[in-house]
């Protein structure tokens, strides 16, 4: 990790610092968010409504936010995202007496996630390409930063909630200020292409962007690869608690298990960083994800151990996919492309959750996991072969 950080440019280090403080502030009260809202008097239906509003706002605004970033400046949009997140947490932490206020806070929360997508990250990628640096180093360092901040935030939030309650949000607000300052210190050179785009209207930007996407099959296959990844991600994140509860694991250990799953990201990133990846190895990892978990058919208890193994293998693949995305993204529409990928993931997530829920109803959660993981492996294998063919 230290080696990767040292290799980064000044701007890349500042972006990593901004992401670290921003994600730490976001996750600090995140582990106890449901408990906090319940204690404020909201019921589970209202909490589900808040989550739905968050997802809808993030999905609807993500692609437009990428276009805004390409048109008006990625640094400015990133800083706007931090300010929006600051306002959201301020309302949640200190003005949570009324449901309408919290609902508006979740609208801001979803908007902040959308605004952040493909902003300073795209600037760093362009800077690395200009200086002919290895994008993998930045991608790995960024993954380490996000994983560590999530783990630290989740642990500290769980430990300090009983003593601090809503004051945890005050710490988050201070961390957001640090993230804003780190982003403000970034200085990126403006290319001639950026100056030309500033003179174009939003409609023209959309028209040209879709023409670029239509004429490039690798970009389309890259979007499909990220959409296929939701066949693994959504069942894992949304249903692992159910799987472990049915396996006899007490709920009181779920906080520790959550942190352990975050650590799986770190392990997967380490493996990817240390291994020289070939297309053949990546395909082996993709198939192993489903094949290894399929052994849980032998014993339900075995699934509790095999799921983390599958998660580690997935993160190895996903890290590789993230690097590929940064390499093939069109320079003139990088933020728009990153946001379009995020939008496709959001839509695919809804489909994945529907498939998972249907499978659980008919075959049970263990077999549902196996079905979804094999669907992920098959779809990813086909899309990856098509991507390599037209690359």
Annotate each language-model stretch with its function.
Residues 34-35, 39, 150-171, 245-247, ...:
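Transmembrane alpha-helix termini and helix-breaking/packing motifs in multi-pass membrane transporters
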Residues 1-9, 188-224:
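Juxtamembrane intracellular "pre-TM" segments in multi-pass secondary transporters
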Residues 78, 282-283:
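Primarily marks hydrophobic transmembrane alpha-helices of the MFS/SLC 12-helix fold
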Residues 169-172, 176, 180-199, 385-391:
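Helix-loop junctions on the cytosolic side of multi-pass membrane transporters
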Residues 2-60, 216-259:
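Helix-loop boundary and gating motifs at the non-cytosolic
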Residues 83-97, 287-301:
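C-terminal ends and interior cores of transmembrane alpha-helices
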Residues 107-147:
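Cytoplasmic helix-loop-helix junction between adjacent transmembrane helices
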Residues 20, 88, 99-116, 302-318:
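Hydrophobic core of transmembrane alpha-helices in multi-pass small-molecule transporters
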């Amino acid at each position: 990790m230290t080696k990767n950080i040292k290799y980064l440019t000044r701007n890349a280090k500042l972006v990593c610092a901004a992401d670290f403080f921003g994600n730490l502030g976001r996750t600090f009260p995140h582990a106890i968010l449901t408990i906090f809202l319940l204690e404020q008097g909201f019921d589970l239906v209202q909490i589900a409504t808040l989550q739905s509003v968050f997802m809808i706002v993030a999905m609807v605004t993500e692609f437009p936010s990428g276009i805004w970033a390409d048109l008006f400046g990625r640094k400015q949009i990133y800083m706007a995202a931090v300010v929006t997140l600051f306002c959201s947490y301020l309302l949640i932490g200190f003005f949570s007496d009324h449901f309408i206020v919290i609902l508006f806070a979740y609208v801001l929360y979803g908007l902040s996630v959308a605004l952040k997508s493909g902003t300073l990250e795209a600037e760093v990628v362009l800077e690395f390409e200009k200086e002919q640096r290895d994008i993998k180093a930045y991608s790995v360092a960024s993954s380490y930063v996000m994983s560590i901040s999530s783990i630290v935030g989740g642990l500290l939030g769980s430990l300090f909630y009983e003593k601090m309650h809503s004051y945890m949000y005050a710490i988050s607000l201070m961390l957001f200020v640090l993230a804003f300052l780190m982003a403000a210190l970034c200085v990126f050179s403006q290319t001639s292409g950026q100056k030309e785009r500033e003179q174009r209207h939003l409609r023209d930007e959309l028209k040209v962007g879709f023409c670029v996407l239509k004429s490039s099959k690798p970009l389309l296959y890259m979007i499909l690869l990220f959409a296929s990844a939701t066949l693994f991600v959504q069942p894992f994140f949304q249903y692992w608690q159910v799987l472990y509860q049915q396996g006899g694991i007490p709920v009181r250990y779920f906080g520790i298990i959550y942190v352990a799953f975050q650590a799986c990201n770190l392990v997967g990133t380490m493996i990817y960083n240390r291994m020289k990846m070939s297309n053949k190895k990546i395909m082996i990892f993709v198939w192993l994800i489903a094949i290894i978990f399929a052994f849980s058919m032998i014993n339900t208890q075995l699934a509790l151990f095999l799921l983390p193994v599958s998660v580690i293998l997935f993160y190895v693949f996903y890290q590789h996919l993230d690097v590929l995305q940064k390499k093939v993204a069109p320079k003139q529409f990088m933020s728009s492309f990153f946001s379009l990928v995020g939008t496709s993931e959001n839509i695919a997530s809804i489909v994945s959750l529907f498939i998972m829920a249907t499978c659980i109803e008919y075959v049970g959660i263990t077999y549902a996991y196996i079905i979804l993981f094999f669907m992920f492996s098959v779809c990813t294998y086909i899309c990856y072969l098509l991507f390599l063919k037209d690359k």
